């Protein structure tokens, strides 16, 4: 089964860095995406806020250079997580994060 997602946007919540009891580092943040997409010959506004998690030692270097307001492209897969309130939420498990140059 295919499960791939690539999403660009702005980090809108402060990245939360944790280390699991087994020693695996995790970084969680929320990515806000806004764009105009074409559907059935019409332009429509696309918007979402997607929780993102990136795990593992090899991926943590990039997480220390991202902050609220950073523009990034995230590639990975999606999965459901159960929130503390018992509701399910979709989460993007990042395998790759690229900073988008703002041109400043």
Swiss-Prot record:
Gene3D superfamilies: Nucleic acid-binding proteins. One of its GO terms (molecular function) is single-stranded DNA binding. This is Replication restart protein PriB. The keyword rRNA-binding does not apply. Changing residue 47 to A: About 2-fold less binding to ssDNA, 3-fold less binding to dsDNA. Significantly decreased binding to ssDNA and dsDNA. Involved in the restart of stalled replication forks, which reloads the replicative helicase on sites far from the origin of replication; the PriA-PriB pathway is the major replication restart pathway. During primosome assembly it facilitates complex formation between PriA and DnaT on DNA; stabilizes PriA on DNA. Stimulates the DNA unwinding activity of PriA helicase. Belongs to the PriB family. GO terms for biological process: DNA replication. It comes from the Bacteria. Residues 1-101 form the SSB domain. InterPro entries: NA-bd_OB-fold, Prisomal_replication_PriB. The gene is priB. GO terms for cellular component: replisome.
């Amino acid at each position: 089964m295919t499960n791939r997602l690539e999403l660009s946007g702005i980090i809108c919540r402060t990245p939360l860095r944790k280390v699991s009891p087994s020693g695996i580092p995790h970084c969680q943040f929320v990515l806000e995406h806004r764009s105009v997409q074409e559907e059935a010959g019409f332009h429509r506004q696309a918007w979402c806020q997607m929780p993102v998690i990136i795990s593992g030692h090899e991926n943590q270097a990039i997480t220390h250079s991202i902050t609220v307001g950073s523009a990034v492209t995230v590639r990975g897969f999606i999965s459901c997580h159960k929130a503390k309130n018992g509701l399910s939420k979709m989460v993007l498990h990042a395998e790759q994060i690229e900073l988008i140059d703002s041109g400043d």
